[in-house]
A protein has these predicted regions:
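Gly/Pro-rich hinge or "lid" segments in bacterial periplasmic/extracellular proteins
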Residues: 25-85, 89, 206-207, 211
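Structural transition elements
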Residues: 61, 158, 183-215, 232-235
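Ligand-site clamp/hinge motif
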Residues: 49, 77-123, 241, 250
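A local structural motif
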Residues: 7-9, 82-93, 219-225, 242-256, ...
Length: 356
């Protein structure tokens, strides 16, 4: 403690100050009133169990009532360092059915609703007093090839990876099938993250893909594709099956429950798989440490797909330790370009959080 409003944080790991601060900005590092929480600690849990049902933070609102899986009532925190908000209270209700959420909104019983889905939002477009906001989320969908699959050597062929980038109908998926709930994004850092590449160099071009395959001497290409049997994953997979066929690539879908797909990927039993990614914290390393790092021990995305990348490992470790913020972002931009140029991933789209 430096003074009543300043603390000094030190760490032993060789990581940049930016990463440390970004991790501290996540919910796991929330600041709470020690004098209030400490007496309620049990079994060395630092008051964690008590905090599940009580409020002791410094944010704009504090929890007044919490009913798990039903509702939470928050009231303005007059002692917040930023001052009390204009709203005196906020009620957040869990309403599982999207149609019911839409009805509550239309009747004026709710001021805001989230996760309504494309059909419900379409029904609300243009209605008086209704505004739809779309905000980029960090959710990304991608196609991954298991380079360690012994049954299909095509999965480890860089020429096939390159061709695959030109066989995804990005616009058809995002604009038509997913109705604007996602947008095309083709790098491992999502839009909104510092250092994210927002360029989309790849388009649906089966003729170009055929040229790449022919030049590499690849004949009758085919692979199986593991996918969760629910939207948006199965929707994306069906589009890929159709668009890859136009490039002469046969794709056999293996739809299953999410737990089954996850188990097969963890066991390295897949050839191709449609997967979703969400970062753990707001820093480039959260994604780079999984897509561009494989130490052979941890279950990173690169590791799960058998991609051995000793040089990229070094680049990832160098980026996490770089103290200069501008230089650090440049390192991540170069890594994204490397993965766009050659990697067993095809980054397809990024999600939108739609609020009505």
């Amino acid at each position: 403690k430096i003074d009543d409003h300043t603390v000094q944080v030190q760490w032993s790991a060789d990581v940049s100050p930016a990463l440390a601060l970004n991790i501290l900005s996540t919910p796991i590092a929330s600041i709470v009133d020690e004098k209030l929480v400490a007496p309620n600690a049990k079994n060395n849990d630092f008051g964690n169990e008590w905090l599940k049902m009580h409020s002791a933070g410094s944010g704009a609102f504090k929890m007044r009532t919490y009913q798990p899986h039903q509702a939470i009532v928050m009231e303005a925190n007059a002692s917040s360092p930023t001052g009390a908000p204009k709203l005196k209270s906020v009620i957040i209700k869990n309403v599982p059915d999207p149609a019911t959420r839409r009805l509550l909104l239309q009747q004026g019983d709710a001021d805001m609703a989230r996760d309504l889905g494309a059909d419900q939002i379409d029904a609300l477009q243009g209605k008086p007093g209704v505004k739809v906001m779309s905000i980029a989320s960090a959710e990304q969908n991608y196609l991954a090839f298991n380079t360690g699959n012994k049954d299909n050597p095509l999965m480890s062929n860089p020429a096939f990876w390159e061709a695959a980038r030109w066989l995804v109908d990005y616009d058809g998926i995002t604009k038509n099938l997913l109705k604007g709930q996602y947008f095309t994004h083709q790098s491992f850092l999502p839009v909104g993250f510092p250092g994210a590449l927002e360029e989309t160099p790849f388009t649906f071009n089966p003729a170009k893909a055929k040229e790449i395959l022919a030049k590499a001497g690849i004949k009758d290409p085919h692979f199986t594709l593991d996918v969760e049997n629910k939207p948006p994953f199965i929707t994306i997979a069906q589009s890929i099956q159709a668009s890859f066929a136009q490039g002469g690539v046969k794709v056999d879908l293996l739809p299953a429950a999410g737990s089954q797909v996850y188990s097969r990927v963890r066991a390295h039993q897949h050839q191709g798989a449609i997967r979703m990614w969400l970062p753990d914290y707001f820093d480039a390393h959260s994604n780079a440490s999984s897509f561009a790092y494989n130490d052979g021990k941890s279950s990173t995305v690169a590791g799960l797909n058998g991609w051995k990348i000793p040089e990229l490992n070094k680049e990832t470790l160098a980026a996490i330790a770089e103290p200069d913020s501008a230089k650090r972002l440049d390192l991540y931009k170069k890594m994204q370009q490397e993965l766009q140029r050659s990697s067993p991933y095809v980054f397809i789209d990024q999600g939108k959080t739609q609020i009505v």
